[in-house]
Amino acid sequence: KVPGSTSGDADSLFQEGIRIPVIRIRERDQLIPSVLDLLLDNTRVPQEREGDLTAQMSANLIGVQRIQEAYRRYGDDLEACMKELVAYSERRVRAVVATLPDGEYSYTDYVDGCGDKYPDPLPIRVKITVAGDSLTFDFTGTAQQIKAPINVPYPCTKAAVFFSVKALMGDDIPANEGINRAVNIIAPKGCIVNPTEPSPIGAQIDCCQRIPDAIFGALAPIFPDTAVTAGNGACTTTILAGEGAIGTDSVFIFHEVIAGGGGASRIFDGLSGVQVNMTNTSNMPIEATEMEFTKILARKYELKEDTGGAGQFRGGL
């Protein structure tokens, strides 16, 4: 409905642009030009996207090369090491969970509704059960999916849960599949965190951001020094676009993260001017912005005073 952007009133996935399934872009060490053309023909800045894709493919190819070199050197020991690293992460997570008091811990957060069709806040409910050395996250009671683009695809819900577990369990635990093995997730089909097709999902990050907030709220009683209060709970961005250099048919598209800051804990202030939870992105420096986008001039860019929650430790600005 809104080319190149997300329509706030999209009521179907088919209104949000072309759908591209998982397809090969390279095969037998050769680029598949038709697939690249499909991607580039659907963007206003094909040169930028081609550069991005080429860089990602090159990085992956180097990664493949390094793994092959390591395997030729170490053989089956390398694979055994990889398996042990996954098992180690699982043991570490389960060891932490085993120290927690068994029980059920619940919390409800809310995401803003969408326009006149959904004026009321939508609940995201989670009940977390600690049983022995495993965790179960149950989203029963969460709002039903809606005909608006903030539904969260189930893989994103899983990612939000696993992010939250990793954040609470310790930053020295290797991030891999082992963390996930200690976690069970229940998300009823048709709710806003496990929608069915063709529910729109273009702005899902604004709802997905609330999932860690709900989880941290539920687990705060047993992680008092680690869990943080809610941040701005959204992915706030600015998109500017326009004509490029005079005398050319080029265009520019500038997408900037305008972060709202993170929540505080009982032992430290919240971070200011950064995205947290599911985005963790930083802003683009003004100098780099003005050099790359010559039609953009920043007059002022600063933190707004007194926008963090007050307290002994304040929220981020």
What are these regions (language model features)?
Residues 1-317:
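Glycine/proline-enriched, intrinsically flexible loops and inter-domain linkers
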